[in-house]
Amino acid sequence: MKILKLKQDHINKYTMKNKFLIFIIMLISTGSFSQERIISADTSKITKHSTIILNKKVNYSAQIGTQPIWDVEGQVIATLHYTYYKRTDINDDSNRPLIFSFNGGPGSASIWMHMGYTGPYSLTIDDEGYPIQPYGYKTNPYSILDVADIVFVNPINIGYSRILKKMSKEEATDKFFGVNQDAKYLAEWMSTFVSRTERWKSPKYLVGESYGGIRVMALASELQQNQWMYLNGVVLVSPADYELRYESGGIILPVVDFLYFTATALSLIHI
């Protein structure tokens, strides 16, 4: 009986201990989820690095942060998250190109161009674009950082970019969500960024991937007309042409699908 009582006491203590731990975990979890995520409107962090591009050492700084968007009254209404790579072993950057890179979607983050194409590091993937185990990243020997500084920008509601002012869905759409609205606030943001980093003398380029092709075309016009920023060039990476893609009676989709139909037919023959 004494042994049974000791076992029962041990079970009771173990049960109470578990209940206490569960209570603490629930308390912490409730506090964590009840707190609203706060994103600073204007902040940055700079670190120093070096990499190898085309068998040559390149020293550079990486600046990550957020930069505000203001309304006509000077109130902060939103903030855009960005990553800025700048080569640091160059004495004069007045002739060094500055590139602003955008992905498509239009709701796609800049991480795809950042870690998949032009940044100093890239994901470990095969020739078809699939990840290779063990998963990770590596130095990108094809990065363009050796010849140009790069700013990867996340538009509103992408990545850590957020609307900070409370507004209705209709107000947000009128301000941010549309081809022209997109170009307008991005142009204002770019003008501020170039002023802050003192890069007005630098040659400036835009890179747009997929829908980013449409974005940078509209942005180039907006920059020239309303920000007095004249670009030196625009780079389109597999740009999307939605009018051509969905044009009634067009031949683009049938031509693209033809190879897949042929491969399917050949595979059926061998079954």
Name each model feature, range by range.
Residues 269-271:
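Conserved small/polar residues in nucleotide/adenosyl-binding loops
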Residues 208-221:
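Glycine-rich nucleophile elbow surrounding the catalytic serine of serine-hydrolase chemistry
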Residues 74-175:
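N-terminal cap/lid subdomain of alpha/beta-hydrolase-fold enzymes
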Residues 199-211:
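Alpha/beta-hydrolase fold nucleophile elbow
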Residues 35-98:
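Catalytic-loop region of hydrolases
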Residues 19-28:
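Sec-dependent N-terminal signal peptides
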Residues 155, 233-245:
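Active-site nucleophile loop of the alpha/beta-hydrolase fold
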Residues 145, 155, 175-194:
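Alpha/beta-hydrolase active-site loop
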